[in-house]
């Protein structure tokens, strides 16, 4: 029985080689639209789909392959006598290969196009053919990914057929693709309508397999959103090896912290926790301030700066071992210096972080919430003493940092530098003591949540703290206010909590 292949592709890379391979094996090629024209121009013998259906393309190409003569040829089960009898009676030929890739909706939805223009890139005929072929994978070879062309050709060369195992895998890839494609369309159409829809569909594409996850015994891979360009799916590696699982997680937080500030800022980070954060006039100044805040923890850590890195900064950075250095850009002479460290990963972050929903898996489900991107609308002074202008600036700085520290979280600040960070403690007094121990000489203390008792204020006073900022909201707020008044400390309530679990 003569074999037939239906080829209809938007991305034509590799399709000429595949079509020629099939024609050399006497497989009849059927195509439509631009693919038909492309194959014809490249001397591939091909039939136009309208010759099969006796029906022209219509509605500006919206209807080309949506026809019973096409889909019956794909869906007919070859060892089902009734199916084959129906095909014979209707003079319908079987289709044995379906080679289709889709309109680039993933790419176009991210471009600056009108709503109507984006809608035109929603493919209908392609998914219909792919789904039909994938359902009937026992009899039809379905190719939705150009990376699989060679696998199919190799099996045909070796065995004169495509194995059941590969057919099944290719069919699975179709439905995997279609779920992502449909998710992207769904999210596009529901954007701004339902913040938390009835069914959660997310669309991510694998960028790379990672060597391992958090630990060597854990497998891992990195997936990129198909729907928007965030900071972590658009960076460029300018030096060093590929990023690890831990590198990517840490870089994400370090870059978010640095981008919290309009002024030049640096975040040094280790194990997903900031260990030194500073603002200042230039990249060298903020790096050295962040380094001095905790010269021990920064070793082997990640550093992100929200400004171009110059040679002077790079020369300071290479004095110690760092895993990753990230910035929006680098001077050429700075890159030369950084590249003297062969294993130092130098990352150009092209985008600022996008405020999207945050998801975390639990056993049997996913929790979804909005990003914690809100700061206080007003700062309410609740004590007799008011903070100075510099103390208020440090308070706001501290609240920008503390929301990235695991709760219970305390940050001690002095002159635009987080001098002490205490986090991940099961009670607030321990976090306070940890931050104060590291941040001796700090003037301002920021807390991610209210003080349940006055003990944190008393501890702060013993260590020279002059001003405190916290959300407020405890039933014992008055005790903390009274303690501040006793110690001559100013305190501000924000009304905005920043728990991080």
From Swiss-Prot:
Pathway: Purine metabolism; IMP biosynthesis via de novo pathway; 5-formamido-1-(5-phospho-D-ribosyl)imidazole-4-carboxamide from 5-amino-1-(5-phospho-D-ribosyl)imidazole-4-carboxamide (10-formyl THF route): step 1/1; Purine metabolism; IMP biosynthesis via de novo pathway; IMP from 5-formamido-1-(5-phospho-D-ribosyl)imidazole-4-carboxamide: step 1/1
Entries under PROSITE patterns matching the protein: MGS
MF term (GO), any: IMP cyclohydrolase activity
Reactions mediated catalytically: (6R)-10-formyltetrahydrofolate + 5-amino-1-(5-phospho-beta-D-ribosyl)imidazole-4-carboxamide = 5-formamido-1-(5-phospho-D-ribosyl)imidazole-4-carboxamide + (6S)-5,6,7,8-tetrahydrofolate; IMP + H2O = 5-formamido-1-(5-phospho-D-ribosyl)imidazole-4-carboxamide
Entry-linked Gene3D superfamilies: 3.40.140.20, Methylglyoxal synthase-like domain
UniProt keyword Transferase, yes or no: yes
NCBIfam families referenced in this protein's UniProt entry, alphabetically: PRK00881.1, purH
Name of protein: Bifunctional purine biosynthesis protein PurH
Organism: Clostridium perfringens (strain 13 / Type A)
């Amino acid at each position: 029985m003569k074999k037939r292949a239906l080829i209809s592709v938007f991305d034509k890379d590799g399709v000429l080689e595949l079509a020629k391979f099939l024609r050399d094996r006497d497989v009849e090629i059927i195509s439509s639209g631009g693919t038909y024209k492309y194959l014809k121009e490249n001397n591939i013998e091909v039939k136009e789909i309208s010759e099969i259906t006796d029906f022209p393309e219509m509605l500006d190409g919206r209807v080309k392959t949506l026809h019973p003569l096409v889909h019956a040829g794909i869906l007919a089960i070859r060892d089902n006598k009734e199916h084959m009898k129906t095909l014979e009676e209707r003079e319908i030929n079987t289709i044995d290969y379906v080679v289709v890739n889709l309109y680039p909706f993933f790419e176009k939805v991210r471009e600056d196009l009108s709503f109507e223009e984006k809608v035109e890139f929603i493919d209908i005929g392609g998914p219909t053919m792919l789904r039909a072929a994938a359902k009937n994978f026992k009899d039809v070879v379905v190719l939705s990914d150009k990376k699989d062309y060679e696998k199919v050709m190799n099996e045909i060369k070796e065995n004169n057929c495509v194995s059941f195992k590969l057919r099944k895998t290719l069919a699975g890839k179709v439905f995997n693709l279609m779920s992502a494609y449909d998710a992207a369309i769904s999210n596009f159409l529901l954007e701004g309508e339902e913040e938390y829809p009835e069914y959660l569909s997310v669309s991510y594409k694998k960028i790379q397999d990672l060597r391992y996850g958090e630990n060597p015994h854990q497998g891992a891979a990195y997936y990129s959103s198909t729907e928007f360009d965030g900071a972590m799916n658009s960076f460029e590696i300018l030096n060093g090896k590929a990023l690890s699982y831990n590198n990517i997680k840490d870089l994400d937080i370090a870059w978010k912290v640095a981008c919290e500030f309009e002024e030049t800022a640096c975040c040094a980070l280790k194990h997903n926790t900031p260990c030194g954060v500073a603002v200042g006039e230039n990249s060298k100044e903020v790096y050295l301030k962040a380094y001095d805040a905790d010269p021990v923890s920064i070793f082997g850590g990640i550093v992100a700066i929200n400004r171009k890195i110059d040679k002077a900064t790079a020369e300071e950075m290479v004095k110690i071992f760092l895993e990753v250095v990230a910035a929006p850009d680098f001077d050429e002479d700075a890159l030369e210096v950084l590249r003297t460290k062969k294993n130092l990963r130098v990352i150009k972050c092209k985008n600022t972080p996008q405020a999207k929903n945050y998801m975390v898996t639990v056993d049997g489900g996913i929790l979804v919430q909005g990003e914690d991107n809100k700061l206080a609308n007003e700062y309410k002074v609740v004590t007799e003493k008011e903070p100075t202008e510099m103390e208020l600036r440090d308070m706001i700085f501290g609240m920008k940092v503390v929301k990235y520290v695991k709760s219970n979280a305390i940050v001690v600040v002095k002159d635009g530098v987080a001098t002490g960070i205490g986090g991940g403690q099961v009670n607030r007094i321990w976090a306070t003591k940890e931050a104060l121990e590291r941040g001796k000489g700090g003037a301002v203390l920021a807390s991610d949540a209210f003080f349940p008792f006055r003990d944190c204020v008393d501890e702060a006073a013993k260590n020279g703290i002059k001003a405190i900022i916290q959300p407020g909201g405890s039933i014992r707020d008055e005790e903390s206010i009274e303690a501040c008044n006793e110690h001559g400390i100013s305190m501000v309530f924000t009304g905005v909590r920043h728990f991080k679990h």
